[in-house]
Structure formats: structure tokens, C-alpha cells
Amino acid sequence: FDAFTTGF
């Protein structure tokens, strides 16, 4: 999960 880059 990467809310700052992909949102996933």
C-alpha cells in the first residue's frame, strides 16, 4: 500500500 505514490 502506498497512498503517496500510487494510492494502492
Swiss-Prot record:
It is found in: Secreted. One of its GO terms (biological process) is neuropeptide signaling pathway. The keyword Secreted applies. Myotropic peptide, enhances both the frequency and amplitude of spontaneous hindgut contractions. It is synthesized by abdominal ganglionic neurons. It comes from Faxonius limosus. GO terms for cellular component: extracellular region. It comes from the Eukaryota. The modification Phenylalanine amide is found at residue 8. This is Orcomyotropin. Keywords: Amidation, Neuropeptide, Secreted.
